[in-house]
From Swiss-Prot:
GO terms for cellular component: extracellular space. Its EC number is 3.1.1.32. Residues 24-33 form a propeptide. This is Phospholipase A1 1. Keywords: Allergen, Cytolysis, Disulfide bond, Hemolysis, Hydrolase, Lipid degradation, Lipid metabolism, Neurotoxin, Secreted, Signal, Toxin. Disulfide bonds join 37-120, 209-214, 252-261, 278-302, 279-327, 295-300. Loses its activity after heat treatment. Not glycosylated. Expressed by the venom gland. Residues 1-23 form the signal peptide. It comes from Vespa affinis.
Amino acid sequence: MMNLKYLLFFCLVQALHYCYAYGDPSLSNELDRFNPCPYSDDTVKMIILTRENKKHDFYTLNTIKNHNEFKKSTIKHQVVFITHGFTSTATAENFLAMAEALLDKGNYLVILIDWRVAACTNEMAGVKLAYYSYAASNTRLVGNYIATVTKMLVQQYNVPMANIRLIGHSLGAHTSGFAGKKVQELRLGKYSEIIGLDPAGPSFKSQECSQRICETDANYVQIIHTSNHLGTLVTLGTVDFYMNNGYNQPGCGLPIIGETCSHTRAVKYFTECIRHECCLIGVPQSKNPQPVSKCTRNECVCVGLNAKTYPKTGSFYVPVESKAPYCNNKGKII
């Protein structure tokens, strides 16, 4: 039933794509007339996690200084923002698992952005899929919110931009991109990295760089492609990893029907790449289907937090298995 709903969702979104402008709410007067998923700073929440404090309490811009880390004069952690997508939440199991993997890996300050109201998560189950266009139009506003928190970190807590990384899934990937644009507009500099996990395709894949996540949004933009309907095969970043060619992920069933599974696999893949060094290896598209066993550090790239330490950029094919940890490298590390 859920797969049928998403199949209908594809058709609806593609029709709406020709009726409305997306990515910038100022471009669409029609969306302003009736918005069932309105954006407000007050409805965006943050879960702030460290190794010492893993409570899933919610904070806002007004209450963030109640958190112990924000009572200090300086924050010395590397900071990672995680942003969910359409009809999801920061408390979804896959995002909490990613946050936990980060904390196991290093002494990070993890900020999960919960914009469920503007992402239409709270709407009636049978109706909210029709509201995708409203959530898409809110992404820039949520990106501006992340930029506001970033400004606080930089100016009040002496966090260098080089210590801040953004991770976003689906619409959350574009939200992260808009945050990257906004911090540059505020003259804060660039984020060290933005990681887009299967960035949403509908409403964005045909847009110019200013209206979607783009390689100029951070010093390094890593994109993981896992679906070609909910996601996109368009190259967007410094490096673009096409997992199993970017669609129909192993273990997700038939094309289209398994699209939702493929779309969410991006989060699972990246979480495994946090847990396991060089879990998944990207082979240059020009050399596909070269086996990863022939890869060297100078031509291939490992997906994950260390991707930017490799010299190669561009598009990469990544073979994956159907079950966690999804590695197809037979223990090879480059």
